[in-house]
């Protein structure tokens, strides 16, 4: 398991006048973010502990120990919260933390280099893997078993089976 900090949440706008904030949790179970103990900023300069949490529409509403006013809460808007990697539970087979995938080499099933994994996105319809080739625009591909049949963390690469549209095959249309 790689070391370092993993981003598990982002603080949003204040909620109410007593220092509560909206919190977007990046954990599978949104409430698990409070199980990891104190959360820190990326630079480690500030530490936050969740005193209470409740579910809202698409986020949590939390109170943080030591944050008691709306003004204090407003200053935290946009702050990302991290935990040490070793505090996270181990992944199941075919499950990965996004942080483990970032920076891996991306190669085709024939071994040709495609680039490096720069991000994993989810816009609501499933995970998307973003690959930056050595030159040109990035590739956004569905992170499915069909398109990404192999993830090898030990070797440091993902194997990509590019869809036909990506490979540049000509469509089966007579007018093309």
From Swiss-Prot:
Pfam families: PRC_RimM (PF24986), RimM (PF01782). GO terms for biological process: ribosomal small subunit biogenesis; rRNA processing. InterPro entries: PRC_barrel-like_sf (IPR011033), PRC_RimM (IPR056792), RimM (IPR011961), RimM_N (IPR002676), RimM_N_sf (IPR036976), Transl_B-barrel_sf (IPR009000). It comes from the Bacteria. It comes from Rhodopseudomonas palustris (strain ATCC BAA-98 / CGA009). Binds ribosomal protein uS19. It is found in: Cytoplasm. Residues 93-166 form the PRC barrel domain. PANTHER family: RIBOSOME MATURATION FACTOR RIMM. The PRC barrel domain binds ribosomal protein uS19. GO terms for molecular function: ribosome binding. SUPFAM superfamilies: PRC-barrel domain, Translation proteins. Belongs to the RimM family. GO terms for cellular component: cytoplasm; ribosome. Keywords: Chaperone, Cytoplasm, Ribosome biogenesis, rRNA processing. An accessory protein needed during the final step in the assembly of 30S ribosomal subunit, possibly for assembly of the head region. Essential for efficient processing of 16S rRNA. May be needed both before and after RbfA during the maturation of 16S rRNA. It has affinity for free ribosomal 30S subunits but not for 70S ribosomes. This is Ribosome maturation factor RimM.
């Amino acid at each position: 398991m790689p070391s370092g900090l993993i981003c598990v949440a982002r603080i949003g706008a204040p909620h109410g006048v007593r220092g509560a904030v909206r919190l977007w949790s990046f954990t599978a179970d949104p409430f698990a973010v409070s199980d990891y103990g104190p959360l820190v900023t990326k630079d480690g300069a500030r530490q936050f502990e969740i005193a209470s949490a409740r579910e809202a529409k698409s986020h949590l509403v939390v109170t943080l120990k030591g944050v008691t006013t709306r003004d204090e809460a407003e200053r935290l808007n946009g702050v990302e919260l991290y935990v040490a990697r070793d505090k996270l539970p181990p992944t199941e087979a075919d499950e990965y933390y996004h942080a483990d995938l970032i920076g891996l080499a991306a190669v085709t099933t024939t071994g040709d280099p495609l680039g490096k994994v720069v991000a994993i996105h989810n816009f609501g319809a499933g995970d998307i893997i973003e690959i930056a080739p050595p030159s040109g625009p990035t590739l956004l591909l569905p992170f499915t078993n069909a398109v990404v049949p192999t993830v090898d963390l030990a070797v440091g690469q993902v194997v990509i089976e590019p869809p036909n549209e990506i490979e540049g095959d000509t469509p089966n249309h007579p007018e093309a």
